[in-house]
Swiss-Prot record:
Family listed: Belongs to the tetrahydrofolate dehydrogenase/cyclohydrolase family.
HAMAP family according to UniProt: THF_DHG_CYH
Full protein name: Bifunctional protein FolD
One example of a Gene Ontology biological process annotation: L-histidine biosynthetic process
Function description: Catalyzes the oxidation of 5,10-methylenetetrahydrofolate to 5,10-methenyltetrahydrofolate and then the hydrolysis of 5,10-methenyltetrahydrofolate to 10-formyltetrahydrofolate.
GO function terms (MF aspect): methenyltetrahydrofolate cyclohydrolase activity; methylenetetrahydrofolate dehydrogenase (NADP+) activity
Pfam families associated with the record: THF_DHG_CYH, THF_DHG_CYH_C
Gene symbol of the encoding locus: folD
GO cellular component, one term: cytosol
Subunit structure: Homodimer.
Organism from which the protein derives: Wolbachia sp. subsp. Brugia malayi (strain TRS)
Length: 295
């Protein structure tokens, strides 16, 4: 019987537990987690993401503010704003909502965020810590959430064959390193890879994040595999817009041990782990043990 992984329910449980921990941190350590989100421009999809992040933060006791800046802001002005937040001791987490306008160097902006406040964990130093396998550090939210779902199904991943489809800095590459740290044998595939079906057919775990609707087919997946679909694709079906993943869900699910739907799979976990990262950042800044937050 295939497990349809309910990411929304799992994320809700994580946030409920986190809310209780935040109450303890406030009461016993005078830690009041604070997240600042910088949103440049007026991208409609980004507006939805930002609104959901702020709503979730406030619902569990994290102080949150979205700083909206015009899309014609100069790069140096944006960097000045980030440095202002870097120097604010009451701010624990800083998130720069991507994408940024074309005239702004996103890499430069991301690496301006203080390492200890980088709750997206995109700063080069946090990336280096992940690659080195350092514990008790900030890890990108989406792959961290995806790994949490995998380990709810299969607690011991040692020796498992895993395939990651997609090599982005946001999902694919960090997912590769997280699975490697679990002692998986990991293969990362991308747009130039050949024989994708052959690699996937040997995998115990498949994580896909390529942004291509119904890309992963039933014939690619072996019986009993765990399939984590990070893709979010907007398609028109019978005149209606619908969100679907990278996986041909209805066909693939029949072969899997467990699979995530889209929507309602990895997406809610991303927001949950952003909240967790914000609290971890606050604890690390205040020298309070945060090891039990790291899944």
């Amino acid at each position: 019987m295939t497990i349809i992984i309910d990411g929304k329910k799992i994320a809700s449980g994580l946030c409920e537990k986190l809310s209780q921990r935040i109450d303890v941190l406030k009461r016993e350590h005078s830690i009041f987690p604070c997240l600042k989100v910088i949103f440049v421009g007026n991208n409609p999809a980004s507006q939805v993401y930002v609104r959901n992040k702020q709503k979730k933060a406030e619902s569990i006791g994290i102080s949150s503010e979205t700083i909206v800046l015009p899309d014609n802001i100069l790069e140096n002005e944006l960097i000045e704003k980030i440095n202002e937040l870097n120097n604010d001791r009451f701010v624990n987490g800083i998130l720069v909502q991507l994408p940024l306008p074309n005239h702004i160097n996103a890499s430069k902006v991301i690496n301006t965020v203080s390492v200890e406040k980088d709750v997206d964990a995109f700063h080069r130093e946090n990336v280096g810590k992940l690659v080195k396998g350092e514990k008790n550090c900030l890890v990108p939210c989406t792959p961290k959430g995806a790994l949490h779902l995998i380990k709810l199904v299969e607690t011991n991943l040692s020796g498992k064959n895993a395939v990651v489809i997609g090599r982005s800095n946001i999902v694919g590459k960090p997912m590769f390193h997280l699975l490697l740290q679990e002692n998986c044998t990991v293969t990362i595939l991308h747009s130039q890879s050949k024989d994708l079906a052959e690699y996937c057919s040997k995998a115990d775990v498949v994580v896909t994040a390529v942004g291509k609707p119904n890309f992963v087919q039933e014939g690619w997946i072996k019986e009993g595999a765990i399939v984590i679909d990070v893709g979010i694709n907007s398609v028109s079906i019978e005149g209606k817009t619908k969100l679907i993943g990278d996986v041909d869900f209805d066909r693939v699910k029949e072969k899997t041990k467990a699979i995530t739907p889209v929507p309602g799979g990895v997406g809610p976990m991303t927001i949950a782990f952003l909240m967790i990262n914000t609290v971890i950042a606050a604890c690390l800044q205040k020298k309070v043990d945060a090891s039990d937050f790291v899944s």
